[in-house]
A protein has these predicted regions:
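Conserved class I S-adenosyl-L-methionine
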Residues: 30-37
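Helix-to-beta-strand junctions that scaffold the AdoMet/dcAdoMet cofactor pocket
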Residues: 138-140
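S-adenosyl-L-methionine
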Residues: 62-104
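Conserved SAM-binding motif I beta-strand of class I
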Residues: 53-58
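C-terminal catalytic and target-recognition region of SAM-dependent MTase-like enzymes
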Residues: 142-201
Length: 201
């Protein structure tokens, strides 16, 4: 059997939260973070607790409500967080038109999903175009760009290629890792996704 998949996923997420929280705290300036496919808000709250102003976007109204409740229970009710129920791709396209930029972008896209108006999301077809769009709203002195993918269809090397290609204008470094679950009876690791981190040098 597979050992607590959710537990290991949570451990991996917390490692990412610790990583970017330190970057936000050490930036020495105000940091604007965009969190796409933001679910129940773990990354949003970690970034806000570290001192960032956060825009939290998810297509599910129920998830955004849950995330707001998590903010209250975490003592972050009054933190500078903007809560939005929206299709992530359409939101980014509007931000490009508005000329808004962010110092850091986090995304945790599903393998498959639907936007609030029935928009279809398929990670294999849409992740690279979305990274390309996000590069257009990344500030000149960006801190980090984080993509988590819980699908085996996206290898770490592919994630590194996509992020490196779209963020080549920034002076930074990409590191991508496989996310895996330990299988108790064999000692092997079951691949379940990949995580790609870009950080400024």
């Amino acid at each position: 059997d597979v050992l607590g998949s959710r537990g290991l996923g949570d451990v991996y997420k917390r490692q990412n939260w610790d990583w970017f929280s330190e970057k936000i705290r050490n930036a020495g300036r105000p940091v604007k973070v965009l969190n796409l496919f933001a679910y129940t808000g773990g990354a949003t709250l970690a970034a806000a607790a570290a001192g960032a102003t956060v825009t939290h976007v998810d297509a599910s109204k129920g998830m955004v409500t849950w995330a707001k409740e998590n903010a209250v229970s975490s003592g972050l009710k009054d933190a500078p967080i903007r809560w939005l129920v929206d299709d992530c791709v359409k939101f980014v396209e509007r931000e490009i038109r508005r000329g808004n930029t962010y110092d850091a972008i986090i995304m945790d896209p599903p393998s498959y999903g639907r936007g609030p108006k029935g928009e279809i999301w398929k990670i294999e077809d849409m992740i690279h175009p979305l990274i390309r769009l996000c590069a257009k709203i990344l500030s000149e002195d960006a801190l980090f760009f984080l993509v988590n993918s819980y699908t085996t269809g996206l290898a770490p090397a592919v994630l590194t290629y996509m992020i490196s290609t779209e963020l080549k204008s920034w002076n930074g470094h990409v590191d991508s890792q496989e996310i895996g679950l330990p299988v108790t009876n064999s000692g092997l690791v079951l691949p379940c996704g990949a995580s790609g981190r870009w950080e400024s040098r």
